[in-house]
Structure formats: C-alpha cells, structure tokens
Amino acid sequence: MIFTQLLNKMQTIKYNYLLYMKKIAFLFLTIRDVNFTKIWDKYFSGNEDKYSIYIHPKFPNEAKWRTDKIISNIKETAWGFITRAYLELFKEAIKDKDNFKFITISESCIPIQSFDNLYKTLASDNRSWIKLMKITKYKHDVILKKNTGNFIHHYARMCLNRHHVKQLLINRDKLEFFHNMQIGDEYFLSVLYPLSNYKDIEITYDDWEYVNEQVKELKNQIKLLYEEQEHNTNTNNKEKINILQDKIKDIAKNPKSITKVIDDLQKIKNSKAFFYRKFTINSDIEDYWEDIINKKLKIKL
C-alpha cells in the first residue's frame, strides 16, 4: 500500500516536472481581433506560464486585443491565401524554446474545453494533431493534376509539435507553390511527406456536414431544372441554374457560421474537439460558453 502511494507520488512529480516550463503557442490569424476577446481572456486566465500568444491581423492598426502580441512581419492575406501568414507565425513562435506545441487559431474560433484539459492532453502526447482529408477527384484534377509530388490534404486548423514546425521552416523554399495556390492552407503540410508522428484528429471542429447538406439540396434543385428543360423545349432554366451554381460555390467555401447557438448547442457539447468554429461576431455564444466549459470539465480524457 505504501509502495503504491509512493509510486503514484513519484509519477505525479515526474509528470509535473515534464510540464515545467512547457508552453503551448497559440497562433491567431485574424482580420482585426478575435471575435470574442472576453472568452479568450477567461480561458487563458491563471495559466500565464503555460501559453504564448502570437497574432497576425490583416489590419494590425485596427486591432485592440493584446496588441503587444502582434508579430512584426505582417503578410497580405485573402480567402484561401494564408500560408505566408502561417509561416510568419511559426517563425516567430519557434524562437521561444519553451513552446512545445503550436496551434493555429482563427478569429471565429472559441475554446470548448478548459485550458487545463488541453494542456494535460498535449503534454502527454508528443505527436502533432493533424486532421487528414481525402483528395477528391475534382480537387486533384483542378488543383493538383499538373503538379508532380506527393500531396497531403488536411484541415487548415492544426496542432504541430516542435519537430514538425522546424521541418516546415527548414523546407520553407518548398512552400512557394502553396503560397500561390488557393486553399494552400489545406495542403502545405505536404512538404512534410511522408508524414509521421502525428495523430489524425481534429483539434478544431468545423461544421461541414451542414454545408454539405445545403450543397446537396441545391444540386438536387439544379437537377430538377435540367430535367424540366429537357422535357419542355420551350423552357430555359439557364439563368436559374447559374444562380444556384454560384450559390453552391459561395456556400462551399466555409463551414457553417453560427449566430444563434441554441440550435447547435448539443452538437458543441458533444464534440470531442478542443475548439469550435465559425462563430460570427454577432453570435450569442458568450451566453452559453460557461455552460459548455463546465460540461466539458466532467469529461474524463
């Protein structure tokens, strides 16, 4: 009995020693500020020795939140073109030798598990967390077909370990192709091929299921318009079809945006991810966040 207690105490001391001085680097890519500064401040409160913050705002002069954390080298960004900004964030964060994990965060993200849960989980796992995706025939034919090499399709939000960040920076010359490629942020980890020492898991949840259902419904409408046109030569649905096709292109760019949280609350609570997006600037998430975090505290990791 005494031996068991002593062993447990030694393991606790060893665990605390391993955590000593290790920090998680949060790499914020924003337009101005994160959408919910109060939530992030509460999330970080009391853990100041366990995290580092690096911010790359598109418009740094309009940012007000933690302006001392804004990196000096700001790159031009646009939808689908953010890898240069990512690279600058990684370059800045790797300078701190105490940073052992590097998480990319967008302005519309919020944490849905406590900082303590995240820290303990990452400190006990030396792998990167990268959610992989299948390369569809469309994306292969349109984006990759004319380019040789091995490609990895992955979520744009990830958690990299220090080794993988170093490898990215060593191979920065190979990133030029992805800098000039739309949605290069979903492929730039291809420079790490063959990928090893990673866990295929999403650290941030994006609701693409909702978007996919919307796209499916719009495609069905287009199909019906084509069928109507075929059966009635006097009918011309070209304009209607073009409108729906443009709508699909617009919708398919981003995951579901959440303003009224109540419809998604249970899904958020059930998610095993540590972060969730996209919450619009007008979202009422602040009314629910404490409840979400408290529920997550009961989860045994």
Model-identified regions with their sequence ranges:
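Generic short amphipathic/hydrophobic targeting helices enriched at N-termini
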Residues: 6-9, 17, 244
